[in-house]
């Protein structure tokens, strides 16, 4: 920005884009740089103002979703493209964004564990950097594999954390009960926990809901209005809640390593100890459990 170039950060969800926007507004306040946000749900008048600011070059830092890929979004002097959670975008989408400038520098980011061989195939033309250290002040995430018989103790621990003022997630592999799949559903767990934790504000979120409804619930959780969030994997990208200290993943044997890693990464973002309980209801241990413990953060 100080050199006159524009930078754009593209995120896969509006919620994540808003969180990035709030962070950049705070971090750049001392540098007299005012970030601009561009998302699909903006009012037409606000979107028009953002587009004018981008095309004139006044906007030096732009945080956006895929809305920035539209043909009528024109940059004056684009110099840097950052793609967050890059695996959620296609190659053509990333190229289209970098093609809005000349000689654009590109940075792609992900916290998803990608094997070296696959990384070499996907990013053979890019330099790969790994951040192996934890952000300052974080204590790490303790990961445990638990059986059906231990579920009550786990839920008691969740209640203890909520009474201490912290927040929790409970993740299920299904939205509704299925006759063909023997697994817990988000709807059933939500009903159960509402009865069990009736002194706390519990909400349900899943992929079949309207985007506006999902975002509202997630924003309420992020602001501390919701104590416990029951969800499907819809939360694996795009929510940052430092006060969330516990995650319970039901039927963890049904998730892969990358999903479990992404889900677990929703907790442990603050200064408190964090806990992830992998609830396994079959005799077979999830292949990913050993890998998660080996990379326990």
Please name every model-derived segment.
Residues 290-297:
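Conserved small/polar residues in nucleotide/adenosyl-binding loops
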Residues 1-286:
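Inter-lobe coupling/hinge segments of SF2-like helicase ATPases
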